[in-house]
């Protein structure tokens, strides 16, 4: 949800609602402490779409932390968002995914998380009925092992049949 504050100044004066779908404890906190007419919090995409019409789905540093990223994305695409933005996501050039352990630097806090490095080719096959408008480097890297840095990438997709 922190992307909202990064882009809020660009949205000033526009009739935009930014809806965040998050884990339940973040939703509760957001609804109680941060929610405004422009910023809303929901537990599921369906809960959000029941209240708000959404033109854009933004997935920023999300998919790699989901237990089943392909299933989640397949389900999300059934809603035919006019545009889908994938950002800050690690992809491999391989035809298979890699499950890795992300270690948070101790200067931030001591933790480790399972994370996916998704096959870019396999991931792009999900976007049937969408056109890829752009691919971009997010200028962040993901460290694997001691030396290997994997760039975080992004993509912008447009639905060919959205109304």
Model region roles, listed by residue range:
Residues 54-70:
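A short SAM/SAH-binding and catalytic strip from SAM-dependent methyltransferases
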Residues 53-54, 81:
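Local beta-strand N-terminus motif with an aromatic residue
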Residues 1-48:
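Class I SAM-dependent methyltransferase SAM/SAH-binding core
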Residues 1-4, 25-26, 63-64, 90-92, ...:
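Short, solvent-exposed loop/turn segments at secondary-structure junctions
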Residues 110-138, 150, 154:
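Short alpha-helix
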Residues 13-15, 35-37, 105-114, 147, ...:
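Class I (Rossmann-like) S-adenosyl-L-methionine-dependent methyltransferase catalytic domain
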Residues 80-98:
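Conserved beta-strand signature within the Rossmann-like core of class I S-adenosyl-L-methionine
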Residues 65-81, 86:
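A short, conserved alpha-helix within the catalytic core of class I
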């Amino acid at each position: 949800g922190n992307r909202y504050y990064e882009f809020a100044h660009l949205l000033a004066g526009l009739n935009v609602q930014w809806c965040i779908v998050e884990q339940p404890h973040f939703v509760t906190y957001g609804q109680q402490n941060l929610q405004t007419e422009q910023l809303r919090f929901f537990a599921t995409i369906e809960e959000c779409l029941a209240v708000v019409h959404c033109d854009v789905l933004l997935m920023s540093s999300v998919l790699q932390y989901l237990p089943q990223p392909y299933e989640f994305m397949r389900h999300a695409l059934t809603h035919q968002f006019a545009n889908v933005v994938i950002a800050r996501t690690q992809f491999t050039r391989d035809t298979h995914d890699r499950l890795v352990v992300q270690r948070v630097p101790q200067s931030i806090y001591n933790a480790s998380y399972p994370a996916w490095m998704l096959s870019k080719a396999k991931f792009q096959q999900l976007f049937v009925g969408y056109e890829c408008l752009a691919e971009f480097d997010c200028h962040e890297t993901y460290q694997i092992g001691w030396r290997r840095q994997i760039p975080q990438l992004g993509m912008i997709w447009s639905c060919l049949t959205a109304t």
